[in-house]
């Protein structure tokens, strides 16, 4: 039984191709339903995100190859003018399992260790299950992938350390102040970067965040989303700088929103209580001379990127541990796949001996008492289990270089004179 994976991702195709081939949830359901209903696949699942669209298919006929599935997806998206087969990757058998394990454990992500992908794989499995496209193989594959991801998260540090500017800023603030719930925070700028930083702050138990933005309604909307309910008019935030322990700037401007003179006055009002300023703007939002002030800690994007680079280096050092977990699970998954291949022979073998047993017992049904017949049934069942134990164990055993599943199946079928499947 084969399982094929084909798709595009950040390694194989530029973003415009990934966008063109991506599937919405509605399209996802339609696509895999088409594959199943047309008799092309027994099972199917699609993982579709901004960085990847990947098919996982158990084909129902030999004609359904990796190349066939590439063309099928291109045709479904009516993208023949833009998308070519060389934009795709292909994986087969255990290669497919390895790929999904790597994706789920976040070592195939655009950002190493970015854990969001696991939730997206779970969504893909949910969608496939909802349209009855996830059978025994994809179900086992996905649940093994989820188990791999859990082990990777708990047994390695591949997901530790900030690898985004906004998150690095928040981690740095936490290292300096430890308990963010006791600190008052000013966010200057309610755009995407500022919003991310504020949300990361909330995740670290920050409870007192005040937001200011040129467009007051945008600041109010973010404050409501965060649950802080606190905003300052952009024209007046400088009057309150002395009240804040942490200041985050994330605005698009060519002029500094914080200068040395005003921060000097603020520090005098604070009686030199420490302040962290996290400048997430590009160009810089904060006068770099501010760093000369006593108890003033200023970090800009370059400083934060240095932290990110060190964290990424640490994550890369965890890769051998992650690969070891994946290899261990691949062996178990491969052994399970082998049991699927021998299952029909095991069923046929058991059925044949049960049939023999029933025929022989039937001959004595009216020659012995009911009690004696029950004893005979119990005895013959025990004998059958012992007779069949070794051949079944041999069929399920891990394969080595001198053996193969087909040769074992043929051997057992010949010895016990079993008919070929589907005859």
From Swiss-Prot:
Enzyme active site:
50 (nucleophile)
Source organism superkingdom: Bacteria
Record note on domains: Possesses an unusual extended V-shaped dimeric structure with each monomer consisting of three distinct domains arranged along a curved 'spinal' alpha-helix. The N-terminal catalytic domain specifically recognizes the glutamate moiety of the substrate. The second domain is the NADPH-binding domain, and the third C-terminal domain is responsible for dimerization.
Write out the catalysed reaction.
Answer: (S)-4-amino-5-oxopentanoate + tRNA(Glu) + NADP(+) = L-glutamyl-tRNA(Glu) + NADPH + H(+)
Q: What molecular functions are annotated in GO for this chain?
A: glutamyl-tRNA reductase activity; NADP binding
User: What are the residue positions of the site described as Important for activity?
Assistant: 99
Chain sites annotated for binding substrate: 49-52, 109, 114-116, 120
The uppermost taxa in this organism's lineage are:
Bacteria, Pseudomonadati, Chlorobiota, Chlorobiia, Chlorobiales
The organism named in the record is: Chlorobium limicola (strain DSM 245 / NBRC 103803 / 6330)
In its UniProt entry, what is this protein called? Glutamyl-tRNA reductase
Q: Which gene is this protein's source?
A: hemA
Subunit (UniProt): Homodimer.
Pathway this chain belongs to: Porphyrin-containing compound metabolism; protoporphyrin-IX biosynthesis; 5-aminolevulinate from L-glutamyl-tRNA(Glu): step 1/2; Porphyrin-containing compound metabolism; chlorophyll biosynthesis
Which family does the UniProt entry place this protein in?
Answer: Belongs to the glutamyl-tRNA reductase family.
